[in-house]
DNA sequence: TCTGGGGTCCTAGGACCC
DNA sequence: TCTGGGGTCCTAGGACCC
């Protein structure tokens, strides 16, 4: 596969720097932004509990296994990302650190607010993750750019209620670099702009190569073997070297470092290739009936996600895993693909196939830690193949679709799991360990009532 | 005591065909 | 008897992201 600067974005380039071996650009037609919320999950907790701003607090992963977000004060106290809870429990108690369970329904709604707010400042917004957005500016004034950046940060932080940082630069990768610099920047304005040749070079010279978007631990180790330690070191390698020693993704990264845009904006998110729901059990389980209920729950959730995205699947994967960290216990990991007779997103169909798979891979006598269901080979609902089917199957499909529709409308109105399939269950052993869940301040009326009274 | 969950992209290599 | 070599398709697994 050949790497070419994106054809549309190619038009941005107007002048090429004559000096140096490579392409370094002096002027750009368009500008990219990367906005991200600082300590997003913790920040959203502070919004409705203002006293938290003066207390150390963290947000925990499911089952309170590790830290996934830290408040400013917790960061200053030395609490790190992904630290295991069991190592920290005593210290946290001593330091008075509050540990919140994660509440993704609430975070998603806050993320939507951020997206809508930021959209008013640029031509295209792309949701990159729950707490990051890419922006594209088709027109801007070079001298006024820093001031525009500060205005976006000020207005969004105030309007949404959670602090943001912004990086502005001529490619997505450089915008990521600028954003990281903004987080560390001592001037506290929350913005870094990289738009001249000199600014970009200076930034890359001080930027560790392992912090680049797309360079993980494996590449970092490989690059250090070649004495490549900074982003500038990598950018100064000849293209053929990158081609020979790395992948096409790295080649794109190399172009982007040099100001040639290769990673286009994705205004409309592409259709998903697969959808997965999986959970670790709070405590290991070997009982088949309990695992069957968990798999039914996950399969129901996959079917719901499919319907929400207007997709059908043609195959279901089930997997079952023992606790990989308990190396002294006997291990068993397995998965299986079960093909569907026809495309479907109906809960009963997906669940029955998932259970068929589970029965095939379940072995008695193991302490299982995690199970999950994945739906694969996804196609849009609009691709109908009913004409090719036997009448009986077509009829069954229609019945299942109606049933799922009824299920969705009841559950959307009265809350998740108001109506369930018989195979599902919410036994105590299957419940997540989430002792300190914050209210869904923005999405659930009963929770909203709580805060207005309290 | 416990170590998340949900994704994408790319490459290598096997199977198969001509 | 020789057994090359180009092409496609599929899958497992690695690497990376938040």
Each predicted region: which residue ranges?
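Short Gly/Ser/Thr- and Asp/Glu-enriched loop/turn motifs at secondary-structure junctions
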Residues: 128-132, 169-172, 311-315, 366-370
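Catalytic palm subdomain of template-directed nucleic-acid polymerases
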Residues: 135-154, 227
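Compact, charge-rich alpha-helical regulatory domains located at protein termini
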Residues: 48, 162, 180-262, 454
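Residues that scaffold, gate, or flank divalent-cation-dependent active/transport sites
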Residues: 1-130, 134, 257
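Acidic, metal-coordinating catalytic segment for phosphate/diphosphate chemistry
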Residues: 4, 9, 340-454
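A residue-level signal for conserved active-site and pocket-lining positions in enzyme catalytic cores
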Residues: 36, 78, 88, 131, ...
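DNA-contacting surface of Y-family translesion DNA polymerases
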Residues: 4-6, 219, 224-367, 385
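Structured, non-catalytic alpha/beta "coupling" segments that mediate domain-domain communication
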Residues: 153, 157-180, 257, 369
């Amino acid at each position: 596969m050949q790497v070419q600067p994106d054809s549309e974005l190619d038009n941005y380039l107007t002048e090429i720097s004559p000096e140096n071996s490579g392409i370094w650009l002096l002027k750009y037609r368009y500008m990219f932004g990367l906005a991200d919320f600082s300590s997003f999950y913790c920040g959203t907790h502070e919004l409705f509990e203002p006293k938290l701003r003066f207390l150390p607090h963290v947000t925990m992963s499911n089952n309170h296994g590790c830290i996934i977000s830290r408040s400013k004060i917790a960061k200053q106290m030395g609490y790190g990302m992904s630290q295991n809870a069991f190592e920290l429990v005593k210290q946290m108690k001593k330091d008075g650190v509050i540990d919140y369970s994660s509440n993704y329904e609430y975070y998603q709604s806050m993320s939507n607010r951020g997206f809508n707010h930021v959209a008013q400042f640029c031509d295209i917004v792309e949701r990159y993750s729950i707490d990051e957005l890419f922006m594209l500016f088709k027109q801007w004034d070079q001298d006024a750019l820093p001031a525009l950046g500060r205005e976006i940060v000020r207005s969004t932080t105030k309007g949404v209620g959670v602090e943001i940082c912004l990086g502005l630069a001529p490619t997505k990768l450089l915008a990521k670099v600028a954003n990281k610099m903004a987080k560390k920047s001592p001037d506290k304005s929350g913005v870094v702009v990289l738009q001249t040749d000199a600014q970009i070079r200076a930034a890359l010279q001080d930027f560790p190569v392992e912090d680049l978007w797309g360079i993980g631990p494996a590449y970092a180790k490989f690059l250090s073997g070649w004495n490549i330690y900074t982003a500038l070191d990598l950018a100064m390698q000849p293209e053929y070297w990158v081609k020979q020693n790395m992948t096409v993704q790295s080649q794109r990264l190399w172009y982007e470092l040099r100001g040639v845009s290769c990673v286009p904006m994705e205004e409309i998110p592409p259709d998903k290739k697969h959808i997965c729901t999986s959970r670790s059990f709070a405590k290991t389980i070997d009982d088949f009936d309990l695992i069957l209920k968990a798999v039914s729950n996950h399969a129901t959730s996959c079917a719901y996600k499919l319907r929400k995205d207007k997709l059908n699947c043609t195959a279901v994967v089930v997997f079952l895993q023992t606790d990989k960290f308990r190396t002294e216990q006997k291990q068993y990991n397995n998965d299986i693909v079960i093909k569907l007779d026809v495309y479907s997103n109906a809960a009963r169909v997906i669940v029955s196939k998932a259970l068929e798979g589970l029965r095939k891979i379940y072995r008695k006598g193991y302490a299982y830690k995690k199970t999950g269901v994945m739906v694969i080979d996804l196609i849009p609902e609009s691709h109908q193949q009913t004409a090719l089917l036997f009448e009986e199957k077509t009829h069954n499909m229609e019945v299942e679709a109606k049933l799922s529709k009824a299920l969705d409308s009841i559950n959307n109105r009265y809350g998740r799991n108001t109506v369930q399939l018989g195979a599902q269950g919410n036994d105590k052993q299957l419940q997540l360990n989430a002792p300190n869940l914050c209210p869904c301040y923005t999405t659930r009326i009963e929770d909203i009532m709580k805060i207005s009274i309290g």
